């Protein structure tokens, strides 16, 4: 898959699970695939039993996750995803990609503005964006090629963009099964 340009994040919604244990489980099962580029944590679901919308990730937690991930592949990264910057590690940056999954933004310009703030907040670290939610379909539904059109707008506006992810919820709207 990697030779075809497909790259895969092993992402979890950890709830109460121990994240280092999940890193081990995921890498032992899937880490041998050459398309795997890292491990991801959807922070909205990190210790949601303790804090609504997930517990903020501490610097120590982020550093431990990166070390655990890199114990399998030295070049792999850790993706941390949320729409609130305050849920991200306050200062640790090495080996992290910060992904914003905001939705319900109403227009492409509002999306670019929202995501630009995220990019600036975490610059020069790499950032990514998850988009294509049904709540934004009124803005992307009329585009000729929504993943490309939105992606190009984000890359043009946010120089530290590394990852662009279309959500699975509307993937068949864009790429219908044959």
Which residues does each PLM region occupy?
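Substrate-binding cleft of secreted/luminal carbohydrate-active enzymes
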Residues: 103-178
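Substrate-binding cleft/loops of secretory-pathway carbohydrate-active enzymes
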Residues: 22-28, 84-111
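Aromatic-lined carbohydrate-recognition surfaces of secreted/lumenal glycan-active proteins
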Residues: 4-20, 66-88, 101, 126-136
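Alpha-helix N-cap and loop-to-helix initiation/capping positions
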Residues: 17-18, 53-61, 110, 146
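Active-site groove signature of glycoside hydrolases
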Residues: 27-56
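An active-site-proximal structural segment forming one wall of the substrate-binding cleft
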Residues: 1-4, 15-38, 68
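A general structural detector for well-ordered alpha-helical segments in enzyme core domains, enriched
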Residues: 22-29, 58-65, 69, 114-118, ...
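Short, well-ordered coil/turn segments that N-cap beta-strands
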Residues: 4-8, 33-37, 74-78, 94-95, ...
């Amino acid at each position: 898959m990697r030779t075809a340009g497909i790259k895969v994040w092993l992402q979890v919604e950890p709830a109460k699970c121990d994240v280092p244990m999940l890193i081990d489980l995921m890498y032992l099962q899937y880490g041998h695939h050459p398309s795997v580029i890292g491990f991801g944590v959807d922070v909205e679901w990190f210790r949601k039993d303790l804090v609504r919308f997930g517990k903020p990730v501490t610097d120590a937690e982020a550093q431990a996750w990166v070390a655990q991930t890199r114990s399998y592949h030295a070049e792999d990264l850790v993706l941390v995803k949320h729409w609130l910057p305050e849920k991200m590690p306050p200062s640790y940056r090495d080996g992290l990609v910060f992904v914003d999954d905001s939705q319900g933004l109403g227009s492409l310009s509002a999306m670019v503005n929202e995501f630009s703030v995220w990019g600036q907040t975490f610059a020069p670290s790499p950032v990514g964006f998850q988009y294509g939610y049904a709540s934004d379909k009124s803005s992307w539904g009329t585009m000729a090629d929504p993943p490309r059109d939105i992606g190009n707008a984000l890359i043009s506006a946010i120089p530290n963009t590394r990852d662009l992810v279309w959500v699975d919820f509307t993937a068949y709207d864009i790429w219908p099964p044959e």
